[in-house]
Amino acid sequence: MSVDIIPVETSRDLRRFIDLPWRIYDRTRYPQWVPPLRIAVRDALNTKSNPFYRTADRQLFLALRNGKPVGRIAAIENRGHNEFHRDRVGFFGFFECENDQAAANALFAAAETWLRGRNRDTIRGPMNPSTNHECGLLIGGFGAHPMIMTTWNPPYYPDLLEAAGFTKAKDLLAYHFDVSADPPSRLPERYRALAERARVGKSLKFRDLNLKDFANEVERCWEIYNSAWEKNWGFFPMSHESFLHEAQVLKYIVNPRLAFIAEVDGEPAGCMIIVPDFHHAFKTIGNGRLLPTGLFRLLSAKRQIRSGRLMILGAKEEYRRHGIFALFVHELERRYNEYGWTELEASWILEDNDRLNRPMRDMGAREYRRWRIYDRQTLAPEAS
């Protein structure tokens, strides 16, 4: 039977696009998979309400065999990225597929054709929908369940991409801290000493994120984020509107003691945000729907969370060479032990970011998961 590729143009097709993972991920075969919240997937795809699409566009495709969906993909034109990097890279994301090379090839071809029509010369991904959101294809660490806002896929997915001609662009790492280890403290003495020296002569303090002043706190974190990540591979600045949109979700799940800002002489210098791993709660929902019982299950499971993801750790450029990383880790160690949590993941960290990778390893963390961003060259028409 041949594969048919159709563009997603109707509400019915969109439902089939969103529902597809439940067809692919057998819960017995893939117990690590965490069903996403359907409302979150719908938001990430919504070109009318999601501010990301003010400077981006996308086209969704479904792969059908005998009329039944066997794969999906989004082709994404990210003009914000292109303007910042002065390149013609196009993107793909939200990729899911049965172990069917013909279907995968057809999906990539459809996305590439759409991007080529928009003068893109490379197709890169997966991005869901950008590096400021969920991204990367898991290539190592399949045995662990994914932390919140990270991706998981079956082990055959990398084979589908590589057989289709995709090659490595960059790897992203996750480190695991066993906070329950004896002794629980993992900060080497030299980092403690560096942290103490960094404090000397500086009016530096850490304070909890103030959820009652949420709009202004988002403004501060947005400025730090765009400054701290500016030179990272694949980064492009988030608009204030997009940052606020994404932060609205975090407002309801972060613990202010584990989302804190560093101030120097009263000015925001950096921030660290650890997100409780609600994926444990998402698993109890199963079907990805908050109603009629999902919300209750989510709130009930919240009390049992004992792990988190270090999602944001950044400082403005003028403070990066003054021991502020050691100060953040010293403060994190003190706060994390208050709650009796047992696990912490730090992700994503670029494979060549030695400024973070080396201290992670020094502190006894182990690399336990790795994602890959893939590229494939395409033949875009010359710009007119």
Stretch-by-stretch model annotation:
Residues M1-V34, I39, E382:
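Generic start-of-chain signal for non-secretory N-termini
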Residues V3, T151-G234:
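Acyltransferase donor/substrate-recognition loop-hinge adjacent to the catalytic core
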Residues L14, R79-N82, T131-H133, D182-P184, ...:
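Flexible loop/turn segments at secondary-structure boundaries
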Residues P21-R65, I73-E83, D208-L209, D213-G314:
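A conserved beta-strand-loop-helix scaffold within acyl/acetyltransferase catalytic domains
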Residues I76-G80, K283-T284, Q304, L313, ...:
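Alpha-helical subdomain
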Residues E83-G165, I285-M363:
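Acyl-donor binding region in acyl/amide transferases
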